[in-house]
């Protein structure tokens, strides 16, 4: 998947993505797994890629996202990724097996590099 992104694949993420990414970095720093300077380099390098943040999904938080989170017993964060892929007809990439199963049940195609 990383190679596809490097090669210029379109990447679309829900609005929560930036906060999830920052949280991951902050937790890793707190646990001394990564230095703040490394986080800064990572974020700078990430800017080189075209990543579209879909703000429209926020409009569906109280309906589709909530329904999918309940139905598939996922977090609202996970359900926001499902909602985005379903609404925009995008393939779905994850290593989370239960999330992948939920995507399959929704008829969302898996990402094929």
Language model regions located:
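Short, well-structured N-terminal submotif of metal-dependent ribonuclease cores
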Residues: 1-17, 28, 32-41
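Short beta-strand scaffold positions
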Residues: 13, 76, 93-94
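Acidic catalytic patch
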Residues: 15-18, 38-71
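Alpha-helix capping/helix-boundary segments
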Residues: 17, 60, 81, 98-99
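Short amphipathic alpha-helical interaction patches enriched in hydrophobic/aromatic residues
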Residues: 25, 29, 50-51, 69, ...
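Acidic, PIN/NYN-like endoribonuclease modules and their adjacent C-terminal/linker elements
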Residues: 82-113
